[in-house]
Amino acid sequence: MTTYAIGDLQGCHTQLLALLDKIDAITPQAQLVFVGDIVNRGPKSLATLRHLYGLRQRARIVLGNHDLNLLAVACGLRKPHHADTLDDILAAHDREELLTWLRHQPLALEQDGHLCVHAGVLPQWSMQQALALSGEVEAVLQSENWVAFLHGMYGNEPARWDDDLQGADRLRCIVNALTRLRFCSPDGRMDFKTTEAAENPPAGLLPWFDLPDRKTADSTVVFGHWSTLGLLMRPNLLGLDTGCVWGGKLTAVNLQDRTTIQVACPQHQRPSKKN
């Protein structure tokens, strides 16, 4: 079965439809994997979320930071940012059905031998460990304690993974790695201040995927999140955030043969240091 991995949508529903038309013209009913940030900043977050909900028999998603932010805003833990475009979801008659489905999605998944995440994987983690740690977060997010989990989710510390981490600190570190990571120090300490392109790392930092002895180096990691990185294709990496909401492109890559399909996107937001 053919599978396409698709980059950050961020509420760009029109471009999603155009991309799916191109995919279906080549491989009708191909399996789909979306690497998170389904909603927010684009003009049609509700339509995008509803469309993926309708595709759930052929599509899988991992949660991104904007998707988690939607859940936090919806339950009153966070105020919307001035650039957020979530009002249509918050006012929708089917919001609870959509949000319940959303919080039952994983932060990491395996598809055809690929590890799919939104942002990155810490160098200390193997593919199986990343999936297991994602499962810890998923268990809480899908439980009756999900609001309390979201309340403790925000923050940049602990910035370095330790197997002995417990409670909210442990879950926060997992979430930050899988949904926010770009740069790390050589010892695996996460940096959340820098969002620039990977070829210009600050002193003492490297893109997470260039760290030596990364335990997922023998697997192919598929991710999004890093729009200034653009399309990245290496034997063991697929970076798919090509800046759709910023006036770039929406990208799909066939996981079997790496055929690439793209659609151009109008600029809905101006890039900032925290996109």
Curated annotation (Swiss-Prot):
Q: Name the catalysed reactions.
A: P(1),P(4)-bis(5'-adenosyl) tetraphosphate + H2O = 2 ADP + 2 H(+)
Which one of the record's GO molecular function terms can you name?
bis(5'-nucleosyl)-tetraphosphatase (symmetrical) activity
The family database entries (CDD domains) matched by this protein are listed as: MPP_ApaH
From the record, give the cysteines joined by S-S bonds.
none
InterPro entries xref list: ApaH, Calcineurin-like_PHP_ApaH, Metallo-depent_PP-like
Q: Which UniProt keywords apply?
A: Hydrolase
Q: Name the domain of life.
A: Bacteria
The UniProt entry, under Pfam families, shows: Metallophos
Enzyme class at the top of the EC tree: hydrolase
Return the EC number: 3.6.1.41
The record's family statement is: Belongs to the Ap4A hydrolase family.
Function comment: Hydrolyzes diadenosine 5',5'''-P1,P4-tetraphosphate to yield ADP.
Q: What is this protein called?
A: Bis(5'-nucleosyl)-tetraphosphatase, symmetrical
